[in-house]
């Protein structure tokens, strides 16, 4: 099942509240389980460059079913996914993209956030994703 527009809006509200708490301006993207943009919010003052980054973080998280920071760890020189960021018309392999997992353990979409440090981006994304679901997929053979 895909994330609904109501869920996407709730996730954006929670993410925006966390960004305000941290004193930063963010771009927040929600994609469905197919990686298609469902909702987007650009806070006043958020960088223009963060528009694309937020969307790519969300797509990366949904394409691989894991947090973008985890992909980043695997894509370092010598890593099993080295160079992966050049596939799929550009992926983002640093923190700020998180899968959204529904009550049945299925990925319904993902959130991507950009506009501050990767630590803040990740915290804001986690706040948004956690507002509507879980952030970890159950173990699958292809993820071990």
Curated annotation (Swiss-Prot):
It is found in: Cytoplasm. Induction: Up-regulated in response to formaldehyde. Expression is probably regulated by TtmR. The keyword Repressor does not apply. Formaldehyde binds at residues 57, 114, 121. It holds the Pfam family HbpS-like. GO terms for cellular component: cytoplasm. InterPro entries: GlcG_carb_metab_protein, PduO/GlcC-like, PduO/GlcC-like_sf. Keywords: Cytoplasm, Stress response. Its main location: cytoplasm. Disruption phenotype: In the absence of formaldehyde, the absence of EfgA does not impact growth or viability. In the presence of high formaldehyde concentrations, disruption of the gene allows growth when compared to wild-type strain. Mutants also exhibit increased formaldehyde resistance in the presence of other growth substrates such as succinate and methanol. However, mutants experience formaldehyde stress/damage as a result of not arresting growth. They have a delayed and muted response to formaldehyde and exhibit signs of proteotoxic and genotoxic stress. Global transcription response is also affected. The keyword Cytoplasm applies. Homotetramer. Heterologous expression of EfgA in Escherichia coli increases formaldehyde resistance, indicating that EfgA-mediated formaldehyde protection is transferable to non-methylotrophs. PANTHER family: PROTEIN GLCG (PTHR34309:SF1), SLR1406 PROTEIN (PTHR34309). Formaldehyde sensor that plays an important role in endogenous formaldehyde stress response. Directly binds formaldehyde and causes rapid growth arrest and cessation of translation in response to elevated levels of formaldehyde, a potent toxin generated by methylotrophs as an obligate central intermediate of single-carbon metabolism. Translational arrest protects cells from formaldehyde-induced protein damage. Also contributes directly or indirectly to the transcriptional formaldehyde stress response. Required for optimal transition to methylotrophy. This is Formaldehyde-sensing protein EfgA. The lineage of its organism: Bacteria, Pseudomonadati, Pseudomonadota, Alphaproteobacteria, Hyphomicrobiales.
